[in-house]
Amino acid sequence: MDAELLYQKLLAHLRARAAKQSEPIALAGLAIGGAWIAERLARDLKLPHYGVINVAFHRDDYAEKGLAAIRSAESMATHLPFEVAGAHIVLIDDVLLTGTTVRAALNELFDFGRPASVELMVLADRGKRELPITADFVGEHVTVADHQILVLEKTIRDGSDSQYAFQFVLEERAA
């Protein structure tokens, strides 16, 4: 699975949507992978900004994550540089699996106001839902063994931090 190709599919979808729809959209990426995608989409679409949502304090496994959740929240805090109330928001994540992270992101988002609409866009959908959450746009439906996780990585191109490519790496799930 080619993460760059999947990114191009997301970009093409948003460009086609912008051509048909007069209402502006706001991008909000889930930290960390979704935020990378939102940042690049905003740049490629020439949008003035994008938001970042950190779900650390809204996760249902917060007690299990402990200090790791706090460090995550500190490393990339929620930042929404637009008015959430009444906005049409595209929530972006790298991988959709159980739906629990998206649920946590919606809780965090609604702490900032009530959007007019929220759509979900993901690079990869692994299935295996625990909650009734479905992405509005999926780069690709993928099958990955249960003992593995799909991790999005960002590779710098041309020595410029603003020029980077995406790739997926399979890693063994921690015991």
PLM regions: where:
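PRPP-associated nucleotide enzymes
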Residues: 1-175
